[in-house]
Amino acid sequence: MAFDQDTVRRTAHLARIALPQAEIPAVADQLERIMGLVEELRAIETTDVPIMAHPLDLDQPLRPDMVVHQDQREVLMASAPAAEHGLFLVPKVIE
């Protein structure tokens, strides 16, 4: 599939990506290579391959649940843009 500069510009606009004019030819080349790989994958015969959710059929070992009390309020509040009395302040969304 060939990607001309207009297609790249339009795709970048739809994806809300700021793409400088100087980068458009390189991005077009990258998109063509990606689509080439997609075409190679489409050409692979998979009718005899069973459908699977994951290629490895392994169980996930889980640790037992343990109740642990950790007071991390100060650590969590430090990353909040606005907090008051130990609570997050959020913008009012309903008038």
UniProtKB/Swiss-Prot annotation:
It comes from the Bacteria. It is an enzyme of class 6 (ligase). Its EC number is 6.3.5.-. GO terms for molecular function: asparaginyl-tRNA synthase (glutamine-hydrolyzing) activity; ATP binding; glutaminyl-tRNA synthase (glutamine-hydrolyzing) activity. The keyword Nucleotide-binding applies. Keywords: ATP-binding, Ligase, Nucleotide-binding, Protein biosynthesis. It catalyses: L-glutamyl-tRNA(Gln) + L-glutamine + ATP + H2O = L-glutaminyl-tRNA(Gln) + L-glutamate + ADP + phosphate + H(+); L-aspartyl-tRNA(Asn) + L-glutamine + ATP + H2O = L-asparaginyl-tRNA(Asn) + L-glutamate + ADP + phosphate + 2 H(+). Gene3D superfamilies: Glu-tRNAGln amidotransferase C subunit, N-terminal domain. One of its GO terms (biological process) is regulation of translational fidelity. Belongs to the GatC family. Allows the formation of correctly charged Asn-tRNA(Asn) or Gln-tRNA(Gln) through the transamidation of misacylated Asp-tRNA(Asn) or Glu-tRNA(Gln) in organisms which lack either or both of asparaginyl-tRNA or glutaminyl-tRNA synthetases. The reaction takes place in the presence of glutamine and ATP through an activated phospho-Asp-tRNA(Asn) or phospho-Glu-tRNA(Gln). HAMAP family: GatC. PANTHER family: GLUTAMYL-TRNA(GLN) AMIDOTRANSFERASE SUBUNIT C, MITOCHONDRIAL (PTHR15004:SF0). This is Aspartyl/glutamyl-tRNA(Asn/Gln) amidotransferase subunit C. It comes from Acidithiobacillus ferrooxidans (strain ATCC 23270 / DSM 14882 / CIP 104768 / NCIMB 8455) (Ferrobacillus ferrooxidans (strain ATCC 23270)). The lineage of its organism: Bacteria, Pseudomonadati, Pseudomonadota, Acidithiobacillia, Acidithiobacillales. The gene is gatC.
